């Protein structure tokens, strides 16, 4: 959630940022509504504080009068205190209503794009931050997409997964399952080598956690909800891992906080259809290793580069062609201040598939979660939060199968062999 003080003090920047996200002049009127409600909140709070202060003073005076044996005067003041209490209760209800209205508007505002975010309305306007400089794979005649390879080598059973759960829930088996486990372990080892603490978080979260990272209310329709227990299946490990520090004050000396975790991820992907959803291209359940970084505001953009470099290292080590896109304002996620997407090239499909998003949220998440740090002077300030996929497995597996196929089978990258125990799928 945006900080209200930023809306008040940097209104021109907020307007410019929201326009970059596609806000019309009519939609921008919400800013004046927010400021007016905040003015009302301050006014009601001031009047309420004044009444409460007066009530406390009168209560002390009543106590002193009773001690002095002046019961008549004390009882007269008690009736005045009762009147003040009724007025204070009324103001308290008014304050709660105003805050509720204010919060209802605030949660509809997305994060303000960083000044470097490209202009644009949709994915077509994203800018290539780093193009693939090498040659794209040239496949032998008769090469097929990964879903056919998965069937040929008995790696993934899409039909059985659909029979058990529904479409979009692939069942990995044999070397397919071992490849999944190998990738998870490899990615976690690389994160640990970079100083990330490994976390194994819950797969179900409550509404407060989903709200804290921004999934609620923006992405609620894309989440699986367990109504009997009022819990949500996580769409990404970002949600439970970032919430580890919800409501906490982190000593500045303990920063940065670097966390990494593997989880299955669950996404409804409502409205998805067509060739882009075939095989592993778009599924409802997939495995992912996530890295989360909690950082001092002055260092977060240097940190963002380190996270992008980490994901680049993983892609290079897997010997996969990839490119990095800088998302435009119109395609960026609700909570993000800036996002870099990694896309892998799947040679049999001749498509670029997203396998990672690395984002800086600045104070958007930490403001919702009341996550702060305490500086050397004892002052508390909001931290910056960042996260990235390092990596999402489904499309990585798709690219590994497609790009490395030959007449003899599928050869795996060297870095994975110690984890799989085999170098060929045949």
PLM ranges: what are they?
Residues 1-136, 155, 159:
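N-terminal alpha-helical targeting/anchoring segments
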Residues 23, 27, 131-426:
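TRNA-recognition modules of translation machinery and tRNA-sensing kinases, especially anticodon-binding
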């Amino acid at each position: 959630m945006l900080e209200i003080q930023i809306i008040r003090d940097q209104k021109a920047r907020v307007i410019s940022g929201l326009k970059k996200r596609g806000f019309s002049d009519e939609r921008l009127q919400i800013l004046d509504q927010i400021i007016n409600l905040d003015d009302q909140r301050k006014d009601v709070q001031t009047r309420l504080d004044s009444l409460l202060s007066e009530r406390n003073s009168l209560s002390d005076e009543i106590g002193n009068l009773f001690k002095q044996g002046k019961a008549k005067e004390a009882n007269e003041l008690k009736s005045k205190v009762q009147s003040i209490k009724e007025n204070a209760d009324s103001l308290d209800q008014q304050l709660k209503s105003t805050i509720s209205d204010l919060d209802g508007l605030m949660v509809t505002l997305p994060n303000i794009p960083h000044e470097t975010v490209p202009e644009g309305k949709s994915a077509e306007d994203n800018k290539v931050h780093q193009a693939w400089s090498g040659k794209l794979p040239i496949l032998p005649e008769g090469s097929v997409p990964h879903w056919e390879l998965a069937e040929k080598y008995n790696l993934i059973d899409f039909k059985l997964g659909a029979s058990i759960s529904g479409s979009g829930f692939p069942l990995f088996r044999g070397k397919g399952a071992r490849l999944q486990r190998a990738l998870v372990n490899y990615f976690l080892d690389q994160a640990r080598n970079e100083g990330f603490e490994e976390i194994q978080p819950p797969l179900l979260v409550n509404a407060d956690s989903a709200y804290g990272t921004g999934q609620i209310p923006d992405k609620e329709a894309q989440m699986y909800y367990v109504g009997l227990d009022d819990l949500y299946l996580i769409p990404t490990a970002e949600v439970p891992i970032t919430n580890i520090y919800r409501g906490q004050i982190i000593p500045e000396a303990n920063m940065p906080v670097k966390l990494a975790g593997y989880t299955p991820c669950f996404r409804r992907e409502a409205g998805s259809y067509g060739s882009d959803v075939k095989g592993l291209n778009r599924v409802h359940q997939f495995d992912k290793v996530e890295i989360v970084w909690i950082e001092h505001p002055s260092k977060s953009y240097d940190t963002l580069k380190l996270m992008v470099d980490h994901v680049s290292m993983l892609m290079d080590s897997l010997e996969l062609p990839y490119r990095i896109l800088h998302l435009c304002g119109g395609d960026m996620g609700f909570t993000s201040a800036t996002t870099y997407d990694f896309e892998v090239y799947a040679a049999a499909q001749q498509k670029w598939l997203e396998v990672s998003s690395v984002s800086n949220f600045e104070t958007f998440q930490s403001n919702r979660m009341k996550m702060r740090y305490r500086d050397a002077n004892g002052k508390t300030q909001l931290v910056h939060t960042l996260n990235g996929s390092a990596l999402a497995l489904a499309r990585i597996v798709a690219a590994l199968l497609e790009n490395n196929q030959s007449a003899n089978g599928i050869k795996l990258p060297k870095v994975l062999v110690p984890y799989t125990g085999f170098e060929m799928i045949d």
